[in-house]
Protein backbone atom coordinates (compact mmCIF):
# COMPACT_ATOMS: atom_id res chain seq x y z
CA UNK A 1 0.00 0.00 0.00
CA UNK A 2 2.80 2.41 0.89
CA UNK A 3 4.75 1.48 -2.24
CA UNK A 4 1.78 2.18 -4.50
CA UNK A 5 1.29 5.59 -2.85
CA UNK A 6 4.95 6.46 -3.41
CA UNK A 7 4.82 5.34 -7.05
CA UNK A 8 1.64 7.36 -7.57
CA UNK A 9 3.22 10.46 -6.02
CA UNK A 10 6.37 10.14 -8.14
CA UNK A 11 4.32 9.66 -11.32
CA UNK A 12 2.18 12.70 -10.53
CA UNK A 13 5.28 14.78 -9.81
CA UNK A 14 6.81 13.69 -13.13
CA UNK A 15 3.65 14.67 -14.99
CA UNK A 16 3.61 18.12 -13.37
CA UNK A 17 7.32 18.67 -14.05
CA UNK A 18 6.92 17.55 -17.67
CA UNK A 19 3.92 19.86 -18.08
CA UNK A 20 6.01 22.78 -16.83
CA UNK A 21 8.72 21.82 -19.34
CA UNK A 22 6.11 21.68 -22.12
CA UNK A 23 4.87 25.13 -21.11
CA UNK A 24 8.43 26.46 -21.26
CA UNK A 25 9.05 24.84 -24.62
CA UNK A 26 5.95 26.21 -26.35
CA UNK A 27 5.59 29.62 -24.66
CA UNK A 28 9.07 30.49 -23.43
CA UNK A 29 7.84 30.96 -19.85
CA UNK A 30 10.43 29.50 -17.49
CA UNK A 31 10.51 28.95 -13.74
CA UNK A 32 14.29 28.70 -13.67
CA UNK A 33 14.85 32.42 -12.97
CA UNK A 34 12.49 32.50 -9.98
CA UNK A 35 13.97 29.21 -8.78
CA UNK A 36 17.47 30.70 -8.81
CA UNK A 37 16.29 33.46 -6.43
CA UNK A 38 15.63 30.94 -3.65
CA UNK A 39 18.20 31.54 -0.91
CA UNK A 40 18.22 28.06 0.64
CA UNK A 41 20.74 25.98 -1.32
CA UNK A 42 19.11 22.60 -0.65
CA UNK A 43 15.64 23.75 -1.71
CA UNK A 44 16.99 25.55 -4.79
CA UNK A 45 19.04 22.51 -5.83
CA UNK A 46 16.06 20.19 -5.31
CA UNK A 47 13.77 22.44 -7.33
CA UNK A 48 16.31 22.73 -10.16
CA UNK A 49 16.74 18.94 -10.25
CA UNK A 50 12.94 18.58 -10.32
CA UNK A 51 12.54 21.08 -13.18
CA UNK A 52 15.45 19.59 -15.14
CA UNK A 53 13.99 16.09 -14.79
CA UNK A 54 10.81 17.36 -16.44
CA UNK A 55 12.90 18.87 -19.23
CA UNK A 56 14.65 15.53 -19.72
CA UNK A 57 11.38 13.58 -19.84
CA UNK A 58 9.84 16.09 -22.26
CA UNK A 59 12.89 16.13 -24.56
CA UNK A 60 13.11 12.32 -24.66
CA UNK A 61 9.39 12.06 -25.41
CA UNK A 62 9.65 14.67 -28.14
CA UNK A 63 12.63 12.85 -29.63
CA UNK A 64 10.69 9.57 -29.66
CA UNK A 65 7.72 11.21 -31.40
CA UNK A 66 9.97 12.83 -34.01
CA UNK A 67 11.78 9.56 -34.72
CA UNK A 68 8.56 7.58 -35.03
CA UNK A 69 7.00 10.19 -37.31
CA UNK A 70 10.07 10.20 -39.55
CA UNK A 71 9.97 6.40 -39.77
CA UNK A 72 6.24 6.53 -40.45
CA UNK A 73 6.65 9.13 -43.17
CA UNK A 74 9.46 7.21 -44.85
CA UNK A 75 7.52 3.94 -44.79
CA UNK A 76 4.38 5.70 -46.06
CA UNK A 77 6.27 7.31 -48.94
CA UNK A 78 7.80 3.95 -49.88
CA UNK A 79 4.36 2.37 -49.74
CA UNK A 80 2.96 5.15 -51.96
CA UNK A 81 5.71 4.59 -54.52
CA UNK A 82 4.92 0.87 -54.62
CA UNK A 83 1.16 1.53 -54.81
CA UNK A 84 1.62 4.08 -57.58
CA UNK A 85 3.78 1.72 -59.59
CA UNK A 86 1.06 -0.93 -59.37
CA UNK A 87 -1.63 1.57 -60.37
CA UNK A 88 0.36 2.79 -63.35
CA UNK A 89 0.09 -0.50 -65.23
CA UNK A 90 -1.67 -0.26 -68.54
CA UNK A 91 -4.94 -2.23 -68.45
CA UNK A 92 -4.12 -4.17 -71.60
CA UNK A 93 -0.59 -5.03 -70.57
CA UNK A 94 0.30 -8.41 -69.22
CA UNK A 95 1.20 -8.88 -65.58
CA UNK A 96 4.88 -9.27 -66.44
CA UNK A 97 5.34 -5.93 -68.20
CA UNK A 98 4.77 -2.54 -66.65
CA UNK A 99 3.71 0.55 -68.56
CA UNK A 100 4.66 3.82 -66.84
CA UNK A 101 2.63 6.96 -67.27
CA UNK A 102 4.50 10.03 -68.41
CA UNK A 103 4.02 13.11 -66.31
Curated annotation (Swiss-Prot):
Region (Disordered): 73-103
Signal peptide: 1-13
Subcellular location: Secreted
Glycan attachment points: 67
InterPro entries: Mitofissin
GO cellular component: cytoplasm; extracellular region
Keywords on record: Glycoprotein, Secreted, Signal
Protein's name according to its UniProt entry: Putative uncharacterized protein DDB_G0282937
Organism field: Dictyostelium discoideum (Social amoeba)
Amino acid sequence: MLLSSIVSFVADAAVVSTSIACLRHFTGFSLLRPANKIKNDKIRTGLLVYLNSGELIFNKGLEMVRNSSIKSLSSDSNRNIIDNSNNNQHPSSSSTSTSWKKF
